[in-house]
Amino acid sequence: MKVFIILGAINALLAVGLGAFGAHGLEGKIPDKYLQVWHTGVQYHMYHALGLFVVAFLADKLSGIGSVTTAGWLMFAGIVLFSGSLYILSVTQISILGAITPLGGVAFIISWIMIVVAAVKYL
């Protein structure tokens, strides 16, 4: 599906840019603890940007299987919630934002389960 190729590419681009920003723009400006949190956000951002390409491939191969599309939107939501909350937490150091992160993690897990089920069931 075209939308997931576009989302995957945009998110991979953002992950690379945000990784570079963390390494060169934030180093020495935020505590090391929060720099590591930033890098965790970047790492999961890239993993799931690539995951969106997997969704695009499966959505093309299994057209009409709504669970694959749902998995893609959950994965995208996971990027926003998980990585997004870690980025904001890193620069603001507002610890309550850490409560949002697990919601993104759950979205990631559910999306991967849905991909596995669709692959086993329909491929």
Curated annotation (Swiss-Prot):
UniProt-listed Pfam families: DUF423
Subcellular location field: Cell membrane
Keyword line: Cell membrane, Membrane, Transmembrane, Transmembrane helix
Inducing factors: Negatively regulated by TnrA under nitrogen-limited conditions.
Main location: membrane
UniProt topology in membrane: Multi-pass membrane protein
One CC-aspect GO term: plasma membrane
Signal peptide feature range: none
Transmembrane segments: 3-23, 49-69, 71-91, 96-116
Family designation: Belongs to the UPF0382 family.
The protein, known as: UPF0382 membrane protein YwdK
UniProt organism field: Bacillus subtilis (strain 168)
